[in-house]
Amino acid sequence: MAAHDLTQAICQNLDPHLILPLLDHCVDLDIYNEADLKRAKMQVLSRTRLIEQALELADATEKKDLDARMRSISEEEKTWEKQLEPVFEMFENDEVLSIIEATKNKDSLLSELEPYGFTENTADLLYHGSKFYFDRGQYDLAHGLLYNYRAVSTDDKLKFTALWGKLAAAILSGNWQTAQEDMYLLLEYIDGGKNELTAVEQLQQRNWLLHWSLFVFFNQPDGPDGIVDLFMNKETCTNAMQTIAPHLFRYATAVAIMSRRKKRDVMWEFVGIARQDKDLGDDPVVGFLVSLIKDFDFVTAEEKLQQCREVLSKDYFLAEMTDEFINTAQLYLFEVYLRVHSRVSIKNAATRLGKSEDDAEEWLVKLIRDAKLDAQIDPASGEIHITKPVTTVYQHVLDRTKNLQYRTYVIVESLHHLHPNGAFHHSNSSIPALFRRMMNEQLQGGGKSNKKGDYKKGDYKKGGDFKKGGDFKKGGDHKKRAWVK
């Protein structure tokens, strides 16, 4: 199943330190050559100062070079400890912290802190020192240094860079609440109009953030639900995914299926996107959804579901949710099956579910009750008979047109983005043609539309008015994220 493994695609958008957990996960899987994994890990470690880990993998020749580098790093660490000692003492002073919180104008902050030993060089020490300790794997210390750097720095570009670093440090230290706050703060900056990013840079930054967000969302109890809201933000994130990283739709689709009662409408958005990108439909998770609710091809849906079990069990982010996904997907499959069939054989259902007939009957009864279907069991034939509700013409029209107002709004917004100054004419024949096409798709059941998924904002403040944050930029031969020196 290496063909469906996303490790390589995801690693191209991560900092080297974030790549290491994924490579360690791959060691336990029987899909990559062990020697290739070892070589890949050594290449990643060579871009860090994690010499101890590299020594465990190195051969005799490599160890000589690593021993020399280890001695150099040890001397460098002593130098940083000496340089940062007065800085640590200064930030342990409550008066200093009070001044930082109270001073709104960062330009005047330097003069306010001068009596306590703060100089122009202090901010540089915080920034570069955090980079050193991050590379050494001391993520908590690096996070604290970056927090203080962002509190006193007046360099907006470096503060943005530091925000990426702070997010990475929070992820690697398992501080998920702070990581989530940093993630949304980064998104706010990227999407804001005050940054100096070009449209292409914004697109790439969003792409990186979406990949990094997987660590945040899948390591919190209620985190996965937020992934759909973020990924399906049409004005920003959805475009980045479709353009650069369509493989990420696997995660949003999987979460939507697992929480389908709350995310039912958004499933049609995934189907619509998959129709535009045929390769996306090859993904087992997305393919399952398309086969089920678009094609009503239950045989293919079952085949895709079997693939999902194997693929998800080896996915770094979804492995622990495999059973939950399979159980929910089975429920969804049979619910759709019951809605389009008038009778279901209990014996056939038992075979497909891998249950006894009694257990299958009990399982189906519970499903019918939860789905609020009108059905009866016929003991003589061993079948469940489903009574289809009769829908009046008026109700049918209402159901088909209830989202037209929102779809019209989307069209107007799209035209506004194409012509921000309102420079389009109502006589333009392409506009009513586009409107009619969208209307026809809605009336013909071409898919349901969900409202714009606004990502949630968190409370980014900690103990004062200055904000938290951190940042990497992408670099390296393989386009891995790295600090800017």
UniProtKB/Swiss-Prot annotation:
SMART domains associated with the record: eIF3_N
Intracellular or extracellular location(s): Cytoplasm
Residue ranges, annotated region (Disordered): 444-485
Keywords: Cytoplasm, Initiation factor, Protein biosynthesis
Gene Ontology terms, MF aspect: translation initiation factor activity
Residue stretches of biased makeup (Basic residues): 476-485
Function field: Component of the eukaryotic translation initiation factor 3 (eIF-3) complex, which is involved in protein synthesis of a specialized repertoire of mRNAs and, together with other initiation factors, stimulates binding of mRNA and methionyl-tRNAi to the 40S ribosome. The eIF-3 complex specifically targets and initiates translation of a subset of mRNAs involved in cell proliferation.
Record text on subunit structure and interactions: Component of the eukaryotic translation initiation factor 3 (eIF-3) complex.
HAMAP family on file: eIF3e
Name of the protein this chain belongs to: Eukaryotic translation initiation factor 3 subunit E
Organism: Monosiga brevicollis (Choanoflagellate)
